From Swiss-Prot:
Name this protein carries in UniProt: Argininosuccinate lyase
Cellular compartments annotated: Cytoplasm
GO biological process, one term: arginine biosynthetic process via ornithine
CDD domains: Argininosuccinate_lyase
């Protein structure tokens, strides 16, 4: 049996010399993967329970190992556990401590198991929990948006294309577009849970094991749906990491787009919203400044999340199938993206909770830029049997006239309109009211007030 002396790595009986200081520095991952300690302990407990059930170890050994593992968990939770970089990672640190607590019988914990399947089991369990936590945080920000939307159904603002006034919309409808984005993000993360539901434990290094183990038992104990099918693929698989990183990248992109929009709306040129003092900073030289630094932070961090996805893709693209040390970086990459994304969701949630719409400025801007021109074209089609392209040309002529006269469309009188289209009556003037314009878009998914109320209720129920 291997003598697990304190100055020896677990595999020290094969490698006769200590690793160089440089190798120890770059090769150990304990500072990163120690957050897997609970998953590692749970996995080991399930494993030894299975070994006992299959008559591979005795009842006494099983209980001693579980006692030692529970003691280690308490030490870590109370910050009394001493991590040693010599033992590379959390898995070997825990095993080394287990030897110190219960002696040589700790060696049975690794029966029918390799670090390869141990690591990926821990990692999948951690990623499952992280995925569910992100979905909770997305639920929270959706609830925030729904609350703001309920208060602003009849708050009118311009909708933009190319950052130019396009058509009038409800501020609530604009906000509800964010709900759709985050709901898709939730669906993506939820879909990822399926690939995380297969249990790697028991495939050992890459070929499985000659021991009569029960992988269905450990799957059930650890919350997996089923064991993986192929031992080689199991050890090599990091698709679930890519799935997480891709989902995080798309969600970060949504957050960045929203942040960019809020920055623009908060700018002096637009002044559509006011940000709370809680989420802005000042200038070191300009006393009047209130800068949207947190929103700018969200934009910037999106690049890091993107970079992590491409880092992982690049690591994997050159690897033959099975395990290689290159894969050690997978956890640092995923942990970082997870941290950034959760922070970003929390920051945006805080910004939105304290955001104040400048309703009069929104309305004033909605009344500029000939924003009801499309409504006029639609009116001509519906009321004068005019082909849309002809209605488009007629409306363009009216806009050109208003522009020449330096008037808004709602400032034109009926006589001026009849000069261009004689069939128009005074009824057409209602078309130029932006509130009427917004409320007329009754097609499913449109910006009418009833549509918005129904969509808010739909999401509140789910």
């Amino acid at each position: 049996m291997v003598k697990n002396k304190n100055n020896m790595a677990i595999w020290g009986s094969r490698i006769k010399k200590d690793a160089s200081t440089l190798f120890q520095k770059v090769g150990n991952s304990i500072d990163i993967d120690k957050k897997l300690f609970q998953e590692d302990i749970l996995g080991s407990i399930a494993h030894v329970e299975m070994l006992f059930r299959q008559k591979i170890i005795s009842f006494k050994i099983k209980n001693k190992i579980i006692f030692g593992l529970n003691k280690i968990e308490k030490e870590i939770l109370k910050n009394k556990f001493e991590y040693n970089k010599k033992y590379e990672d959390i898995h070997m640190n825990i095993e080394k401590r287990l030897f110190q607590i219960i002696g040589e019988e700790a060696g049975y914990v690794h029966t029918a198991r390799s670090r390869n399947d141990q690591v990926i089991t821990d990692f999948k369990m951690w990623t499952t929990s992280a995925t569910k936590e992100i979905n909770k945080n997305l639920d929270n920000i959706i609830k925030t948006i729904l609350k703001i939307s309920e208060k602003n159904i009849e708050t009118i603002m311009p909708g933009f294309t190319h950052l130019k006034n396009a058509q009038a919309v409800s501020f609530a409808h604009y906000l509800m577009s964010y709900v759709e984005m985050f709901n898709r993000d939730k669906k993506r993360f939820t879909y990822n849970l399926e690939s995380l539901s297969e249990n790697p434990l028991g495939v050992a290094a890459l070929t499985g094991t000659s021991f009569n183990i029960d992988r269905n038992f450990t799957s059930k104990k650890l919350g997996f749906k089923r064991p993986t099918n192929n031992s080689i693929d199991t050890v090599a698989d990091r698709d679930f990491v890519l799935d997480f990183l891709y989902s995080a990248s798309v969600c970060s992109m949504h957050i960045s787009r929203i942040a960019e929009e809020l920055i623009i709306w908060n700018s002096d040129g637009f002044n559509l919203i006011t940000l709370s003092d809680k989420v802005v900073t000042g200038s070191s030289i300009m006393p009047q400044k209130k800068n949207p630094d947190l929103l700018e932070y969200l934009r910037g961090k999106t690049g890091t999340v993107y970079g992590n996805l491409f880092s992982m893709l690049t690591i994997l693209k050159g690897l033959p199938i099975s395990y290689f040390k290159d894969l050690q970086d997978d956890k640092e990459i995923l942990f970082k993206s997870n941290e950034i994304l959760n922070n970003s969701i929390a920051i945006l949630n805080e910004v939105l909770k304290n955001l104040k719409p400048n309703k009069q400025q929104m309305l004033d801007l909605a009344n500029s830029g000939y924003i009801t021109a499309t409504d006029l074209a639609d009116y001509l089609v519906k009321n004068h049997s005019m082909p849309f392209r002809k209605a488009y040309q007629t409306t363009a002529s009216i806009v050109n006239y208003a522009e020449k006269k330096k008037k808004k469309l709602n400032e034109l009188n009926i006589d001026e309109l009849k000069k261009i289209e004689p069939r128009l009556t005074i009824e057409v003037l209602k078309i130029f009211n932006v509130k009427n314009s917004v409320n007329s878009k009754k097609s499913y998914g449109g910006t009418s007030f009833d549509n918005i109320k129904k969509m808010i209720m739909k999401y509140k129920k789910t």
